[in-house]
């Protein structure tokens, strides 16, 4: 009886050890640990342009920013707009860049430079 009990305990121990080896180790993905800096281009600088944001990337890096979230960058709808500037969240065209901020090439430039510096960009 004692041998049977010890054999059963040994068997259970081996089964539990092999079960632990089969479990996947949970990895923490960057999206769960990163900090995010929302870049509202219009209010980011006096110029309110992509080029002005690009000049400030080193400062954002020194601040410890890891991810840049550009919000919003589309042209602003003019129909029923609020105030003189309108709401940036009222997009006129989701496939275009707001010309007040610069060109598509200007936006690509700031994104490319941000990537070179190790930022993630949303």
What are these regions (language model features)?
Residues 7-16:
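Bacterial N-terminal signal peptides
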Residues 1-4:
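Positively charged n-region of N-terminal signal peptides that target proteins for export
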Residues 17, 22-122:
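Acidic/aromatic-lined carbohydrate-recognition and catalytic surfaces
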């Amino acid at each position: 009886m004692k041998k049977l009990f010890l054999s059963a305990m040994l068997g259970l121990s081996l089964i539990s050890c092999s079960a632990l080896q089969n479990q996947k180790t949970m990895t923490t993905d960057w999206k769960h640990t990163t900090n995010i800096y929302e870049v509202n281009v219009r209010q980011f600088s006096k110029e309110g342009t992509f080029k002005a944001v690009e000049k400030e990337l080193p400062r954002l890096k020194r601040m410890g920013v890891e991810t840049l979230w550009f919000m919003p960058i589309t042209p602003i709808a003019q129909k029923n707009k609020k105030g003189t500037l309108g709401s940036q969240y009222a997009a006129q065209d989701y496939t275009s860049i707001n010309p007040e901020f610069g060109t598509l090439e200007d936006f690509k430039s700031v994104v490319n430079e941000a990537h070179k510096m190790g930022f993630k960009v949303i």
